[in-house]
Each structure stands twice: as C-alpha cells, then as structure tokens.
C-alpha cells in the first residue's frame, strides 16, 4: 500500500511538470504552427531562441525583481508587456492572454503570442537570448536532421 501511494505521488508530480521538447520535435511543431519564415524569421532561429530562452521547456519561468515581471514558457514571454499574471504592476497584456496559458504543453498559445511579439518593430530582437546566442550566427544546426 505504501509503495502504491509513493507511485501515485511520483506520477502526480510527473503530470504537473511541463514538457521539455526534443529539438526536432519542437522544429516540426513550430513549422506546423506557422512559425517557419513568419515575419522573415527562419525556423532555425525560432528553435535557437527556444533553446536559449527555456531549454525547450514549456514550464520555464524566470522572475525579474527589477520590474517585478516574470518570463513564461518556451519563449520566456514577459508579463510586463505580453501576458497577464495578475501580479506585474502596470502590465500591458498585448497578447490578451493569461501568462499561465504560456506554460501549457500544447504551445499553440505561446506561438500565437510569439507571433504578436515578433510583429512589433523590434521583431525577434525583443528576445535578449536570441541577440546573444543566435543573431548573426549559423543556426542551421538547430533544424539539422529534422526533416523540416
């Protein structure tokens, strides 16, 4: 009985955790959701961005004490400008979405919000990790062997 309870707790903890995509799985998913070439940004750049922002983890969060905002999900979308977490002072919520929706294993909402972010004048440069790790680099390795 004790072993059954422990097993149940382990399974419960597994179901609560976010999904960590495999590189090619993410590339195929992003392509299916229309990110390949969206606003001139290649699929390889999107996969590179997700690698360095979240490690392909849908459940990633990062609190920013300076402005009391939090970054959410696979693309680390910020609560100051793009989503509503009910905590960030002066939040804009330009994606008209709950920040928790960006933590789902189904990344359709995160992709829709990323499309909104990249549509702003800053484009993909809105993501610091992209500028640091992907910009002006050969990012083809991020989709290599994925058949996309």
Swiss-Prot record:
It catalyses: Hydrolysis of (1->4)-beta-linkages between N-acetylmuramic acid and N-acetyl-D-glucosamine residues in a peptidoglycan and between N-acetyl-D-glucosamine residues in chitodextrins. The active site is at residues 53, 71. SUPFAM superfamilies: Lysozyme-like. InterPro entries: Glyco_hydro_22, Glyco_hydro_22_CS, Glyco_hydro_22_lys, Lysozyme-like_dom_sf. The keyword Membrane does not apply. Residues 19-148 form the C-type lysozyme domain. Disulfide bonds join 24-146, 48-134, 83-99, 95-113. Its EC number is 3.2.1.17. Residues 1-18 form the signal peptide. The keyword Signal applies. Keywords: Antimicrobial, Bacteriolytic enzyme, Disulfide bond, Glycosidase, Hydrolase, Signal. Monomer. Belongs to the glycosyl hydrolase 22 family. Lysozymes have primarily a bacteriolytic function; those in tissues and body fluids are associated with the monocyte-macrophage system and enhance the activity of immunoagents. PANTHER family: LYSOZYME C (PTHR11407:SF28). This is Lysozyme C. It comes from Colobus angolensis (Angolan colobus). The gene is LYZ.
